[in-house]
Amino acid sequence: RIFNPIESEAKNLQYLNERLNFFPKIINFNKNCLIVEFYKNDGNKPTNTNLDFLESIIKIHTISNNLFGFGFNTQIGALEQSNKYENNWANFYSNKRLSPIFELANNKENMGNFINEKINYILKNIKNFIPNNPSPQLLHGDLWEGNIIFNNKKFVGFIDPGSFFGHNEMEVAYLRWFDPPFV
């Protein structure tokens, strides 16, 4: 079956909206179009960490699973993310997140032997750098500043999820990329 990003986004929003109340509701969708509830967004985030925002992330992360992955593939940008379940976080992260991005980047422009050797070393030894078996928790999956809606310095909600069950510290790491870091 050919991956359809619109269907995937709709399924992801349906899943999240059955459990949480800060993702846009689906108004209508088909394989070519997804119409969701409008969230007013002036991009004006609070100068201090917003508790509603942090509590919402915590609510996402309280939903857990026995395995790492998700019931269907999702996406980040134009990249389809395989979410086939695995019982080990290091394997899931290496096989389903890092390796595909590495292969895509290397196919676009060969990074050379030195960089390829270093990346392959990291991929083969990832279990030495990250926990093997943290509790699989639901993640937004694409949590960056553009997917967090603020209006009038108040948290409104999240958009554009690429959800899967993974290690929640991955999402915290995304938030550290903010300028300035948000947590």
Where are these regions (language model features)?
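Short, solvent-exposed loop/turn segments at secondary-structure junctions
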Residues: 29-33, 41-43, 98, 144-146, ...
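Structured catalytic cores of enzymes that bind and process phosphorylated ligands/cofactors
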Residues: 8, 14, 23-27, 59-63, ...
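Helix-rich C-terminal or lid/interface subdomains of diverse kinases
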Residues: 2-3, 33-36, 99, 114, ...
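An alpha-helical support segment within catalytic cores of ATP-dependent transferases
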Residues: 65-138, 151
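Generic structural signal for hydrophobic residues
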Residues: 9-12, 122, 183
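Active-site Asp-x-Gly
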Residues: 82, 87-94, 103, 135-138, ...
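Residues in soluble alpha-helical coiled-coils and helical-bundle/repeat scaffolds
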Residues: 21, 44, 106, 110, ...
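ATP-binding pocket architecture of kinase catalytic cores
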Residues: 1-91
